[in-house]
A protein has these predicted regions:
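AAA+ P-loop NTPase catalytic core and its hallmark functional loops
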Residues: 2-168
Length: 168
């Protein structure tokens, strides 16, 4: 049987070595509760560094991944340090999804916790829903609950990305 090929791996997999090198170099720096990297290291991950980092006996270059406005990235990071929501608004093709994926990978270590908005997105897709067979058999229980990405984000303390929120 042929293995399934991924079109594009998640940011945390694609840039694993860079994230690991930044985490090792960043170990002494302060970071907001639940963050994998300090705000400075998150900035370096997205906007790149001029000097490579020494990691496991090798030089690791932190590449620039976002080719837009550096000040925008810094404002996004500052907003997220305050435990506030961040909404990126712009024309199609302006790297909003890419930036949110990079921020999630650097801050939470997970970029796939996403609610995909559509015209058919319902409240239970955002909060949680129930496995009705288990609900009838056991009553309301944790096993019968089907967590949404938002529920998972709140439970694990990771970022939740909403894609195409205007289409809901």
């Amino acid at each position: 049987m042929e293995a399934i090929k991924q079109i594009r791996p998640q940011a945390e997999m694609r840039y694993r070595e860079e994230l690991d090198a930044l985490a090792a170099a960043d170990a002494e720096n302060r970071r907001p509760l639940g963050w994998k990297l300090s705000p400075r290291a998150v900035r370096d991950f997205i906007l790149g560094r001029s000097k490579p980092l020494e990691y496991q006996g090798r030089q690791v270059t932190i590449t620039k991944k976002y080719l837009g406005n550096d000040a925008l990235v810094e404002r996004c990071i500052i907003t997220l340090t305050g435990s506030r929501g961040l909404m990126l608004v712009g024309d199609p093709g302006t790297a909003k999804t890419m930036l949110s994926e990079l921020l999630s990978a650097a801050i939470s270590g997970v970029s796939t916790n996403t609610v995909q908005g559509t015209a058919g997105t319902t409240e239970d897709m955002i909060k949680y829903s129930w496995n009705y067979a288990l609900l009838l058999a056991q009553g309301p229980s944790r096993q019968a609950l089907v967590p949404s990405p938002l529920y998972t984000g709140m439970e694990r303390g990771i970022l939740t990305r909403f894609e195409e929120i205007t289409r809901t």
